């Protein structure tokens, strides 16, 4: 049922986005997502082409898959408390990092996989519907905005139920190293580009995670 919950989450997120803040939000969201993708591709190519697809137990596929994705529920929660309106509006762009869409684009760019546009459209549609309805009807916008925190909790709980603590031990040192690379290396670049384009760095830090 996580797929349906994520769809509802997208609908709610769309309802919090104002058409007026869309250009600035799209710029901020696009900046940090493109940074994640670019860094993941560069590191993936280095590992895949120069290090024989093995960097301390990490493959190019693992690095690209982890670095190009993000936990958007975590992003939404962090920017809701510490970010500004533009950071929150950028959720409409960063939501693309939740599923395999951005990751598949990154893998396709590095020649490791192909990409289907159908899965991308499936994500954008509920987001657009929520955005349009909320901007046309103020009452709908208020309902969806008030439900933002609840939707983050529900989606986070559902995704958490699909995880297993044993995966931490199975991943071992390589898994820990991958987490460090995603958070510290990837985060350093997303925070830098966020500040470089007029942000506070909160959005860049909030996106420095990987999708569960």
Language-model features: locations:
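Entry/N-cap segments of selected transmembrane alpha helices
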Residues: 1-5, 17-49, 163-194
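Hydrophobic transmembrane alpha-helices of secondary-active transporters
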Residues: 1-28, 127-137, 146-171
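Membrane interface segments of multi-pass transport proteins and intramembrane proteases
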Residues: 45-53, 137-148
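Helix-coil boundary and interhelical linker segments in multi-pass alpha-helical membrane proteins
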Residues: 46-59, 105-118, 162-175
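Loop-centered beta-sheet repeat module
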Residues: 90-136
């Amino acid at each position: 049922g996580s797929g349906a919950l994520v769809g509802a989450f997208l609908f709610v997120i769309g309802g919090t986005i104002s058409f007026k803040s869309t250009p600035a939000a799209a710029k901020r969201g696009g900046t940090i997502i493109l940074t994640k993708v670019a860094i993941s591709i560069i590191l993936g190519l280095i590992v895949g082409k120069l290090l024989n697809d093995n960097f301390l137990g990490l493959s190019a596929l693992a690095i690209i898959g982890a670095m190009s994705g993000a936990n958007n529920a975590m992003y939404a929660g962090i920017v809701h408390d510490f970010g500004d309106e533009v950071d929150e509006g950028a959720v409409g762009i960063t939501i693309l990092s939740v599923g395999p869409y951005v990751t598949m684009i990154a893998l396709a760019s590095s020649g490791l996989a192909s990409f289907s546009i159908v899965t991308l459209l499936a994500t954008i549609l509920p987001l657009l519907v929520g955005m349009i309805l909320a901007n046309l009807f103020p009452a709908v916008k208020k309902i969806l905005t008030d439900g933002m925190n609840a939707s983050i909790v529900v989606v986070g709980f559902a995704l958490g139920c699909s995880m297993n603590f044993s995966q931490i031990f199975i991943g071992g040192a390589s898994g820990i190293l991958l987490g460090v690379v995603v958070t510290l290396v990837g985060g350093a670049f997303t925070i830098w580009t966020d500040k470089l384009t007029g942000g506070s760095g909160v959005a860049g830090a909030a996106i420095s995670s990987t999708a569960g």
